[in-house]
């Protein structure tokens, strides 16, 4: 359990550093170019990096253990951030792609370690996800304040210090491991194709991957940009409420994590999809701010429960040797689906009334009930074998 908390601390340091460097670079790019498009291009750069990492993940892991790969990815992120500090041009976006590429190795590995480090997987996943959301909730406004009161360069230096500390803790974590996952098969068997083949041939892995991917697609209905459009066009209230809506969503996710941390059971995947449909319908039909906030509370909790539940059942049902590869495939699917969803709902918001977009989103969430049911049925099949 000590190793789990060491891993968690390294993840906290890296995540705080991630938020700070992104806030700093967004502000810096906007100041340099005056282009909102350049400042808004970060999600595209991050998605590109995450997608590319999925193409190389299996090959890298065939050469290095999970612990060593985690250390190398964090160390190279630190070196890349040094290059960001030395780069004063729009080419910094290429370095953002590289950092996201390295993150694409770290995140599946961190999730894969959980079943090896702790027995209570639901509790562990609740702690991981809840703390991640708390960092997002706290660090975005704090990061913005740091940049405003100092400079983007100073915020980047603070981020670099955090990356260095994360690297040190990660090295300590790797050295403290008594057992690591090392592939015993032939090197040529561990490829992206082999990972995709496993996901495709295992009913549970296939269904849960489709669930994670489709959930990523429909979750873009609730991105911050659409919430701003909803406030301006539908509720027609002061956009100062935008921050409140975003904070409400994150606080709801943290509360759901706290509940599952103490609970032994969690709602089924299909039931959380139904709850999300209710939230989208309420959000699209109401004309009152209070009910809109209530819908966000409902949706935030349902989303977090799905994230924790899917991670928990994946760690329980997928063999430890296959777990990192399944996570890598899912991460690639997640990133692509999130990009497609953001683009689709953004285009719909330009052409339709925003309330109609949320009602359509409720309709598009319906297949998630069916996919969730298939996932749980295949999970029962695996458990009975």
PLM segments and residue spans:
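Juxtamembrane intracellular "pre-TM" segments in multi-pass secondary transporters
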Residues: 1-4, 175-210
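Hydrophobic transmembrane alpha-helices of multi-pass secondary transporters
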Residues: 3-6, 10-11, 38, 42, ...
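Short amphipathic helix-loop junctions that connect adjacent transmembrane helices
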Residues: 20-37, 225-240
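Hydrophobic alpha-helical transmembrane segments
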Residues: 90-94, 100-101, 123-177, 247-248, ...
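MFS-fold secondary transporters
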Residues: 21, 30, 80-84, 99, ...
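Substrate-agnostic recognition of the 12-TM MFS/MFS-like secondary transporter fold
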Residues: 6-22, 46-58, 70-77, 95-148, ...
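A single, central transmembrane helix in multi-pass transporters
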Residues: 150-157, 196-254
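C-terminal transmembrane bundle of multi-pass solute transporters/carriers
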Residues: 40-59, 63, 67-73, 232-385
């Amino acid at each position: 359990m000590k190793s789990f908390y060491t891993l968690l601390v390294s993840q906290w340091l890296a995540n705080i550093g991630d938020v700070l460097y992104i806030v700093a670079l967004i502000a810096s790019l906007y100041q340099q170019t005056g282009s909102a498009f350049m400042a808004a291009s970060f999600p595209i750069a991050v998605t590109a990096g995450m997608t590319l990492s999925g193409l190389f993940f299996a090959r890298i892991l065939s050469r290095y253990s999970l612990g060593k790969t985690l250390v190398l990815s964090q160390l190279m992120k630190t070196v890349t951030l040094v290059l960001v500090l030395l780069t004063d041009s729009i080419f910094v976006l290429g370095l953002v792609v590289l950092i996201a590429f390295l993150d694409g190795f770290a995140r599946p590995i961190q999730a894969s370690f959980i079943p090896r480090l702790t027995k209570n997987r639901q509790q562990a996943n609740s702690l991981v996800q809840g703390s991640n959301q708390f960092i997002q909730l706290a660090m975005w406004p704090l990061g913005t304040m740091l940049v405003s009161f100092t400079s983007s360069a100073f915020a980047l230096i603070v981020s670099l210090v955090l990356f260095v500390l994360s690297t040190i803790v990660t090295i300590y974590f790797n050295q403290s491991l008594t057992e690591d996952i090392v592939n015993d098969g032939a090197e040529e068997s561990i490829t992206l194709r082999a990972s995709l083949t496993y996901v495709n041939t295992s009913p549970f892995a296939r269904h849960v991957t489709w669930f994670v991917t489709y959930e990523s697609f429909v979750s873009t209905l609730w991105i911050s940009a659409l919430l701003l459009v909803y406030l301006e066009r539908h509720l027609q209230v002061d956009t100062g409420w935008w921050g409140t809506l975003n904070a409400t969503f994150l606080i709801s996710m943290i509360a759901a994590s706290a509940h599952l941390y103490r609970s032994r059971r969690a709602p089924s995947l299909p039931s959380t999809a139904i709850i999300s449909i209710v939230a989208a319908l309420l959000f699209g039909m109401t004309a009152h701010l209070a009910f809109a906030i209530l819908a966000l509370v409902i949706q935030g909790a349902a989303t977090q429960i799905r994230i924790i539940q899917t991670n928990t059942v994946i760690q329980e049902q997928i063999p430890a040797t296959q777990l990192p590869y399944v996570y890598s495939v899912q991460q690639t699917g997640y990133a692509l689906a999130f990009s497609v969803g953001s683009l689709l709902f953004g285009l719909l918001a330009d052409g339709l009334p925003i309330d109609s977009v949320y009602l359509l989103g409720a309709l598009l969430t319906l297949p998630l009930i069916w996919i969730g049911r298939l996932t749980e049925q295949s999970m029962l099949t695996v458990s009975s074998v």
